[in-house]
Amino acid sequence: MASGVRQELAQLMNSSGSHKDLAGKYRQILEKALQFTDAEQLEALKAFVEAMVNENVSLVISRQLLTDFCAHLPNLPDDIAKVVCHFTLEKIQPRVISFEEQVASIRQHLATIYEKQEDWRNAAQVLVGIPLETGQKQYNVDYKLDTYLKIARLYLEDDDPVQAEAYINRASLLQNESTNEQLQIHYKVCYARVLDYRRKFIEAAQRYNELSYKSIVHETERLEALKHALHCTILASAGQQRSRMLATLFKDERCQQLAAYGILEKMYLDRIIRGNQLQEFAAMLMPHQKATTADGSSILDRAVIEHNLLSASKLYNNITFEELGALLEIPPAKAEKIASQMITEGRMNGFIDQIDGIVHFETREPLPTWDKQIQSLCFQVNNLLEKISQTAPEWTAQAIEAQMSQ
């Protein structure tokens, strides 16, 4: 019974003997407490914890036995382990400096329980309580990096990218010191996700694209990273950085396997995209990517409007706001506002004549335009040749040989 355990502990605390003998006797009591079930087990373990944090018990024995106690936590039912962990943390608090290592183990296990229950915020907050930088114990770099990444990931699951960013920034200070390649990958994935959640889409796309080339990452996960890179690029604000990223992805043959390749192709080739062409792509987006902007439009709508405006600037020398609004499928006033913002931010070349209600686009140089069109044509021809060679390899070989012999 639990009361018997409590009595044995009281007697042992008042007895004398060597540390080794006393530790052995306390360990026997712990084993006995673990044999109980349900409420009896809970009460017996609480009694054991109270004895271990009592100042009458040698600190050497307390630390040793609490370490053993922590090792048994994963074997307990989650509901009992959860109560025991909270009880232990509360009782240890006045002497927390003496038991930093044991507290860290308890918090790690408690966070695992909360994570199983999908209580992301409590799991994160439990880990935050580990004094990684301020405690007396010196934690190794990998342990600190792993813990910060866990906290950031848990806050992301709880839809709190602000807190996640705070902890990924702490991880950033450590990641160069770690030689653990797996942790480095976890850091890159987590950092890309934070940028994605924070709507820093072009930076997120660059990180995801980098991950898609890492040989240590499984092939299916590399393709998943590439998909996220493509989605983030499409959602990014129009401009030179996005254009470069579109070019990188368009030239990556793996993108042809992705469902959003059609949108990528239209964007890279500066084609106008209509609203009805976006429904399938919109369904692929994650919840945070479907959020609305300050003017009430979705992130995707805003990105496509900016893309279409940039495409229009390459088709027209100038256009009235009425015509521009009709082309972009938005009110003229909104078209003017977006055009003005893009010109001001240097993402589009041109100027606005508000008296006549016209936006003038900077004259395009014909040579770069021709170069891009020729490049696009060559790319399409190359794709056709590859498909022909896959379907009829013998005919292709004969045709190439005949061409070479001329």
Swiss-Prot record:
TM region positions: none
Record-annotated PCI domain positions: 197-366
Gene Ontology CC annotations of this record: COP9 signalosome; synaptic vesicle
The keyword Mitochondrion is assigned to this record: no
Keyword list, A-Z: Cytoplasm, Cytoplasmic vesicle, Nucleus, Signalosome, Synapse
Superkingdom classification of source: Eukaryota
Pfam families: CSN4_RPN5_eIF3a, PCI, PSMD12-CSN4_N
Family: Belongs to the CSN4 family.
Quaternary assembly: Component of the CSN complex, probably composed of cops1, cops2, cops3, cops4, cops5, cops6, cops7, cops8 and cops9.
UniProt protein name: COP9 signalosome complex subunit 4
Gene: cops4
